[in-house]
Amino acid sequence: MCIRDSIVSDVRKTGLAIILTEILNKCINNFEVSPSLYVHIKKMIISFEHHDFNPVFGIFFVKEILHFFGINPQNNYDEKSPFFNISNGRFESKKDDFLKTNFPHKEFHQLLGMNIDTIFDMKLSVDKRREILALLLEYLSYHEILNQKQIQSVHVLQSIYD
C-alpha cells in the first residue's frame, strides 16, 4: 500500500481524519497555537498512515492536543483516586457528577499513559471508546476550548467505531 494514499483509500481513516480535522479546526480558531502543535500533528498523521486502522487513534489524537491548549489531564489514577474529575483535570476519590456511573476510568487512565508508539496496540470496546470520546469533548468544552455543540461529525465518528 502506498503510504500517502492510506488515509484517502481507507474510508474508515478518511472519516476519522475529517472528524479530527473538524475538532482541531474548532479548537485552533479559538486559540493562538504554537508551531510545536503542528509538528506534533504531523508526527501523528504520519504514524496514522503507517499503521492499520485502529479507532482508538481518534481518541488518542484528541487526548494529545490537550497539552497544547494548556489543559493536559493529570494521570494520577490509583486505588485512592479512581475517578476522573473534569473540572480539576485529575483523578480523585469522589465521582464527578459530569460522568456516568459506569465511565471507564481505568481505561481512560491507560489511554493517558499511551504514546504514539503504543496506541495502535490498544483495544477498547465501542462503548468505552464512546464514553472516553464524550469525556474528552466535554473536557474541551468545560475548559472553553471547544463548543461541543458545533461539532457536526461526531455521529459519523460513532458509526465508524461500530
Predicted regions mapped to residue ranges:
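Non-catalytic alpha-helical scaffolds and adjoining flexible linkers that form interface surfaces
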Residues: 4-162
